Regions:
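Active-site/acyl-donor-binding loops of N-acyltransferases
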Residues: 2, 136-137, 143, 148-168, ...
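A short beta-loop-alpha structural element at the N-terminal edge
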Residues: 14-28, 35-39, 173-188
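Active-site rim helix/loop that mediates acceptor-substrate recognition in acyltransferases
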Residues: 30-76, 80-82, 193-213
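Conserved beta-strand in the GNAT
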Residues: 76-78, 83-92, 99-104, 215, ...
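Conserved GNAT acetyl-CoA-binding A-motif
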Residues: 98-101, 125-138, 257-267
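Conserved acetyl-CoA-binding loop-helix of GNAT-fold acetyltransferases
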Residues: 102-105, 111-124, 142-147, 241-253
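Amide-forming acyltransferase catalytic core, primarily the GNAT-like/NAT-type
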Residues: 128, 147-231, 246
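Flexible loop/N-cap segments at domain edges
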Residues: 210-216, 223-266
């Protein structure tokens, strides 16, 4: 536990490390913060926080991810007021790259300095490793990141539609269902190193237990991988020209699994994937 702080509420706040036992509490902070953000952005779609049944379904779907992040985090900090968790932040390190996975503060406590305090704990100023994050467009949060030298590189949009069973797209790719084997993880990690310049084997071991993984080969050599499930992705391909064939296959697999929704987050710099998705009736969420 570390020193306490006092917000504009004149209520004492203490900061303490988090653990897997705090997963549900931080899930609720995220859901309430996200609902507030969507309201401020003018989005009218209902969020799960107002519907106990929907909230329970969302927690059931995401609990494994929260537990995985808690188990593999490098820094995980909570802001507490009494027994209530009012904010949290977490970062992971993968092969020398630090990723800020979450930074969320309850609406009533935003702009009180809690975000800055939490960020300082999970992104140490003296650290020299490479850093990145996937951030919302919330301007106060953006200001925090910019002050720490984290600058936007590109936007990421969520594309989705009801999946269709599609004819196989003409391609010389061979598609193989991946098993949770050391060999498959090694292949995926090698491709991560080649394209992303770091490995994330611990995440592949979790992903392949949650979703159906696929390896893509050309002339006997691995050229990519992807995951399809209740949540799909990530997809990594050494040649972006393969995205139409891979996404056609992935959508068909989602339909074959009986899913009513197929969606994935796509960096808009991936023009081949974006063009394919838009030309095939996918919708965009902010």
């Amino acid at each position: 536990m570390t020193r306490s702080s006092t917000s504009a509420h004149e209520s004492p706040i203490r900061f303490q490390p988090g653990s897997a036992a705090d997963s549900y509490a931080v899930f609720l902070v995220f859901e309430r913060s996200y609902a507030d953000l969507t309201r401020r952005l003018g989005m009218t779609e209902p969020t799960s926080v107002a519907d106990p049944a929907a909230l329970a379904r969302t927690w059931a779907a995401r609990r494994s991810m929260y537990d995985h992040l808690a188990a593999t985090a490098d820094h995980f900090w909570l802001a507490k007021r009494g027994d209530e968790t009012v904010g949290f932040a977490r970062s992971i390190v993968r092969d020398g790259v630090r990723l800020l996975t979450e930074l969320f503060v309850l609406p009533g406590w935003q702009s009180s300095g809690l975000g800055r305090e939490l960020l300082a704990r999970v992104l140490p100023a003296q650290a020299t490793e490479r850093r990145w994050l996937l951030a919302t467009t919330d301007l106060p949060a953006q200001a925090l990141y910019l002050k720490r030298g984290l600058y936007p590189r590109f936007s990421v949009y969520y594309f989705w539609r009801q999946p269709r069973q599609l004819p196989t797209r003409e391609s010389d790719l061979a598609i193989e269902a991946a098993t949770p084997s050391a060999a498959a993880i090694q292949i995926m990690g090698d491709m991560d190193t080649r394209l992303l310049d770091h490995r994330r084997d611990v995440d592949h071991r979790w992903l392949i237990g949650q979703r159906q993984g696929y390896l893509y080969h050309r002339a006997g050599r691995p050229v990519g991988y992807g995951y399809v499930g209740q949540t799909s992705g990530p997809f990594l391909l050494l040649d972006e020209a393969d995205f139409p064939a891979v996404l056609t296959h992935a959508e068909g697999e989602a339909a074959r699994q009986g899913r009513s929704h197929f969606g994935l987050e796509v960096p808009v710099v991936n023009h081949r994937a974006v063009n394919y998705l838009l030309s095939n009736g996918f919708c965009i969420d902010r």
